[in-house]
Amino acid sequence: MSKEHGQKILRKDNIPYLLSWVLLIFAYTLTIFFISRKITCFLDADMSSELLLAKILSGSNGIITTRWDYSSEIRILYIQIITSFLFRFIKSWHTVRVLSTAIHIAIMLFSYYCLCRSLKIERAFPLTASILALPISYEYITYYLMGMYYLPFITVMFFFLALFFDYCGRDGKRDKKKTAGEITAYVIAFLSGLGGYRMILLFFFPLFLILFFPVMRDLLKGGEDKGHLRRFRFGVIFFISVLCGLILYVFVLSKVFTVQQFDHFFFMPFDSSVLDFNINAFIDNLGYTTGPLMFSGIMKNIGFGAVICLAAFSLFNIPKKEEREESRILTYLFICSVCLFTLVQLFIVRDTVERYISPVVILLVPVCTNNICKAEYKRKRIIAAASVVLVFLKLAGEVTFYRDYKDLDFTGPYREVALYLQENDIGYGYSTFWNGNIITELTDGEVEMYHWESPESMDVSDPSSLRDWLQEKSHLEAFPEGKIAVILGEEELPFTSLAHALEQKEPDLVSDYLYVYVFESNDALVNSSAEYDLDYFYDGTYLVDGYDEDGVRYLYEQGYSYGPMIDLPGGSYRLTITGDGLDDISFMPTAGKGAYVSDAMEVSRDNNTAVYEFCFEYYSDDVEFVIINEGNGTVRLDSVALVKTA
């Protein structure tokens, strides 16, 4: 290195730039270190489902598969591309998760660098990228940095905008590099459309509108702007591309692959509570935190205030020069995305959560960076210095998330259960979704979990009752052979359809709120669930016009007997009555205060035995079996036996 070159690097205005790179490296390293040490404590079923899908894809050499029941989207440009590749060489699921997270965050930061370079503000990249490398909000750290659910969405937005602004900056000149970039943008749009509606609503449709309105304005004024027309041409092609991807998704992919259909779109009346929810969701995504006036909360909300100041200045100081058209496009894109998302939530879809708006909120980072760097004002150094101070305040607030999270542990009981299953060579488990795939990840795939939508729907005699959501399709075809563990939370036990079977044995493991019951096979569990030891004759007050004698119940003419007020899950049942004079009886099941529940079909009946079948569609409380003597003589009831048949 020459002396002159070295002096240039150490030039006064380069020192802050170099320090900003040090800050970015520190922020990125801190995040990856935190994730490597603590991610196991924050796992949930959704996170583990994504890793399980990647493991399946690693053996099929593809990016999508028919072996999987997808949730609401078939995500093409998603984390499985890299994560499944890592599974080919690494057995530890934890190592795969940490490496995949590190790679995807690095790719997201690189996409942001590409955007900054296309906007010609790359010197601001390291400082503002540090914001993206640290927890902006609870939603961002949970669903982006740790969960990675929507991290690819941000990456796609940044890459696409970088390609778009490169296209805008070439002034109609064509070369191979620029043409390749333009084609790449159209391919990204098409692949994004293959993933469903989300990216279209959040990003592509708002961007198309931003490019469409200037052309319409020129048309109405009778003028023509070549720049507007060229950008609109780009918008038309990319929007056609994304629509082609969506059409292929709706009419082909959603038919070939199992995925939840969006069949709940309706026009709805205005509801101010929905508007309140979305405003609060937006604020939360900016980092606002409720709670006591403690150090971490104060720092987070100071950071939130800093973001508000930066956003307000940026949105009200859009560069006005003609060559700064990209500033207006980027700013209006953010505003249009927020407005469109809010309108959809108000009048069409309301099953939303705070994290759905996060990708739109993240657009504020390039918007603020670009507008502050390019806005025309006299005291530029003062504004720049103030902006840097505000950024540091936000960074200080972001770091406190790690301070708050360092002692939290949400998966301790799951880790204990996972260790128990491994030590006892139990390869399969039954649970609801939220207690399912997380066990598979914690055992490095050694325990295969079958999960249902709710504890009430756990029908172990019918595999099709399993939820077709984020698990292998083969699960819905047959139950496994070998030892199985039923894993349920304390709040689920009273409502599970397996309650009868579980009440007959002590739990094999209790880990905080998780209960584990081990059975030698699925058949053993089915048999335990099927046979009910009814105490039908437990109380004489449930006998009208009759009497008890030595454990036998007698009914006079028009007398009736009922009991035992038990809870039964939905399903089919067979009731067998033994005694004398049963030719003259009738039978009816009821629930709660004699409420009619189900017709009973007579299978067979003679003087000594009567067999009936009936079913409950749903879980039923306080079920009673009413037996009525319809004859003229006395009826003797010796026993009443109940078996669940399906």
Residue positions per predicted region:
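Transmembrane-helix motifs of polytopic, lipid-linked glycan transferases
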Residues: 25-29, 99-123, 159-163, 312-313
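Membrane-proximal lumenal/periplasmic loop motifs of glycosylation machinery
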Residues: 37-45, 58-81, 94-95
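Short hydrophobic/aromatic helix or loop-helix immediately within or flanking a transmembrane segment
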Residues: 49-55, 69-92, 281-290
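Hydrophobic/aromatic-rich transmembrane helices and adjacent perimembrane loops
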Residues: 149-156, 298-307, 326-376
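Membrane-interface alpha helices of multi-pass inner-membrane proteins
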Residues: 178-208, 244
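Short periplasmic/luminal acceptor-recognition loop of GT-C membrane glycosyltransferases, typified by
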Residues: 423-458
